[in-house]
């Protein structure tokens, strides 16, 4: 259990605030500078893994090179008792991923502001030839004031180094992985730009562009499928903004932005009036052919190198000479063999007797040694001093006292100055500081009811508010915990207080598709309640309204009512017959009946007034009947024209009964 441990006698670990595959992150307090810091500790099961230790050190080297307001600062790096740790800036807030889950798709202005900060940070890293290789919302922190910080350079690498993944393994998170990384190839600055484009897509739509049943399925989509248009989920995205995403996520790195600064400049001007409706980004057809990028195998890097040792063969003459010399030497050695054995045996016996009588007893009789005075020393210094003198140091006895500083040595047993045998056991009495009492458990209590008591009892009380299922105002967690011994008057108390259950604030779903909104709600464990209504203004299948309204705080399991448009309401039509329409004949000369031309016009659901439905001639008055197909809330109409003069023009109302 690392909570409560001090690293380097300086960084006190307070609580775990995050974790990943290779390391855990703790909130800690820097006792020297009096500030909170984040301490990233390599998991103990990897502390003997050389590859993970190298990666851990690589993160420290990467970040210490950088100094940028949107990159987490690195303060210190160290190793203690097999614990490898990095000390970094503590950023209060949440990850960008948590922010997106809570808020959904972000307003365009806010999303562009975040992307400006992100591209600025990556441009700075790229300037120092550092490629992050794992850009994703999970590795980006956002403060309450909207400032973002890029973190987790654990798999970052210098572009001058070989960046080919060994044994075709893939580094990075599959939803944000560039095609070249998915192939197991080289990761470069354009790989980070691709990941930035995916993050921008998620900010503006509330979702990732690709999903699948497995990591392999998603990686294949990055390799083979074009990024879908973000307008499919957010029709308010201007063309200039969509173009940035499409260019950043081009399959071929050659077609992407060539630098993070170039992408940043496009983001800064994306909402200029002259750019809003610019032409869609596309890759010329002659450049769209798929090019297979081979994986660079490790053995290819060394194919011209050989480790064989070459032995040059001698001549047959030389071999014969060596053979004769060897035979002669063997004959001489046999003659002297027994004489040498006798002399050697005698000498060994003489030496053994001498050692047994003089030297060897000194090895087994311990020397007398005076116990040194280590009182007032730091514990580790005292241990080293005693070990150097040949003593064995046992576990320390902790003594609480106001007279000796915490951690310093009070005395030893045997006492200083006493003469004892070498290798004797020495017990150190170490100061535990002032008398301590067991920490009180405040969890579950209401903060306001005990705030005055806490402020009087402890040196300092720091309160953090978090979302929790426990009642608002209840203390959820505390540091120190109730199993620790503390000096109350000198103790700083940190408490975490519930501000109510975890809340989700859905965005505005207006004109979302039914599938998109149900997917969004299900992902956040909200219950969609779908209802349907006719609408003259919203296309069929799109969201008309929602309840509760956008931005309302909700908790998991809450119901959200969504009204989906059925399109315009169909209107009823009826057939109306008008009988006995009289067409009068009018002669200008008495007694003479000259034929007159009659044109009959009709307007209803099936006919317009732009041409006559019938033309006839009459020599006397006539009567006709007309049928009209009339829709609810509309009218029919007919017109009679005689010799070019309109003589009848009437409306036919929709029957109310």
From Swiss-Prot:
Q: Does the keyword Repeat apply?
A: yes
* Signal peptide span: none
A cellular component term, taken from the record's GO annotations:
plasma membrane
Deletion: any effect?
Spores lacking this gene fail to germinate in the presence of peptidoglycan fragments.
Listed GO biological process terms: cellular response to peptidoglycan; protein phosphorylation; signal transduction; spore germination
Intervals, Extracellular compartment: 367-657
Q: What is this protein called?
A: Serine/threonine-protein kinase PrkC
Record organism: Bacillus anthracis
**Which gene name does the record give?**
prkC
């Amino acid at each position: 259990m690392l909570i409560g441990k001090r690293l380097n006698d300086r960084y006190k670990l307070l609580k775990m605030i995050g974790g990943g595959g290779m390391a855990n992150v703790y909130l800690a307090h820097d006792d020297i500078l009096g500030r909170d810091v984040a301490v990233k500790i390599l998991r103990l099961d990897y502390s003997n893994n050389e590859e993970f230790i190298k990666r851990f050190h690589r993160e420290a080297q990467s970040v210490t090179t950088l100094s940028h307001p949107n990159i987490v600062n690195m303060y210190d790096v160290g190793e203690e008792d097999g614990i490898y740790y990095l000390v970094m800036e503590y950023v209060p807030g949440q990850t960008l991923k948590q922010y997106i889950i809570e808020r959904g798709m972000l307003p365009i202005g806010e999303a562009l502001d975040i992307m400006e900060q992100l591209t600025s940070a990556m441009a700075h890293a790229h300037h120092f030839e550092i490629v992050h290789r794992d850009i994703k919302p999970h590795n980006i922190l956002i403060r309450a004031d909207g400032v973002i910080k890029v973190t987790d350079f654990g798999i970052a690498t210098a572009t001058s180094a070989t960046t080919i993944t060994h044994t075709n393994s893939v580094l990075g998170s599959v939803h944000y992985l560039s095609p070249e990384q998915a192939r197991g190839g080289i990761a470069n600055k354009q790989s980070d730009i691709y990941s930035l484009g995916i993050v921008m897509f998620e900010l503006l739509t509330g979702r990732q562009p690709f999903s699948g049943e497995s990591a392999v399925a998603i990686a294949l989509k990055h390799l083979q499928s074009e990024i879908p248009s973000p307008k499919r989920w957010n029709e308010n995205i201007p063309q200039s903004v969509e173009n940035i995403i499409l260019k950043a996520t081009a399959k071929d790195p050659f077609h992407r932005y060539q630098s993070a600064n170039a992408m940043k400049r496009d983001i800064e001007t994306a909402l200029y009036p002259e750019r809003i409706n610019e032409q869609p980004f596309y890759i010329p057809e002659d450049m769209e052919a798929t090019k297979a990028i081979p994986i660079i195998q490790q053995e290819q890097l060394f194919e011209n190198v050989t480790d064989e040792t070459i032995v040059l063969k001698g001549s047959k003459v030389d071999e014969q000479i060596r053979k004769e010399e060897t035979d002669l030497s063997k004959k001489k050695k046999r003659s002297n063999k027994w004489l040498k054995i006798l002399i050697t045996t005698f000498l060994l016996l003489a030496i053994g007797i001498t050692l047994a009588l003089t030297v060897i007893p000194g090895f087994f009789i311990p020397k007398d040694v005076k116990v040194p005075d280590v009182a007032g020393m730091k514990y580790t210094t005292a241990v080293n001093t005693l070990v150097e003198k040949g003593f064995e140091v046992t576990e320390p006895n902790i003594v609480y006292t106001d007279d000796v500083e915490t951690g310093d040595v009070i005395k030893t047993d045997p006492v200083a100055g006493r003469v004892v045998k070498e290798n004797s056991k020495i017990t150190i009495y170490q100061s535990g500081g002032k008398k301590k009492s067991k920490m009180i458990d405040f969890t579950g209590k209401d903060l306001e009811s005990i705030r005055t008591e806490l402020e009087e009892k402890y040196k300092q009380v720091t309160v953090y508010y978090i979302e929790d299922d426990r009642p608002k105002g209840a203390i959820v967690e505390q540091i120190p915990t109730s199993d620790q011994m503390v000096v109350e008057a000198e103790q700083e108390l940190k408490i975490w207080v519930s501000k109510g259950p975890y809340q989700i604030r859905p965005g505005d779903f207006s004109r979302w598709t039914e599938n998109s909104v149900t997917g969004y709600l299900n992902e956040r464990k909200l219950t969609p309640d779908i209802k349907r209504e006719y609408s003259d203004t919203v296309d069929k299948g799109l969201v008309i309204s929602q309840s509760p309204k956008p931005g309302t705080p909700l908790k998991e399991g809450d119901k959200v009512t969504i009204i989906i448009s059925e399109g315009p309401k169909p209107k009823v039509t009826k057939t109306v017959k008008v009988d006995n329409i009289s067409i009068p004949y009018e002669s200008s000369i008495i007694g003479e009946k000259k034929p007159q031309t009659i044109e009959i016009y009709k307007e209803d659901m099936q006919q317009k007034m732009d041409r006559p439905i019938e033309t006839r001639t009459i020599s006397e008055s006539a009567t006709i009947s007309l049928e009209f197909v009339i829709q609810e809330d509309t009218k029919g109409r007919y017109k009679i024209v005689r010799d070019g003069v309109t003589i009848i023009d009437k409306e036919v109302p929709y029957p109310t009964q």
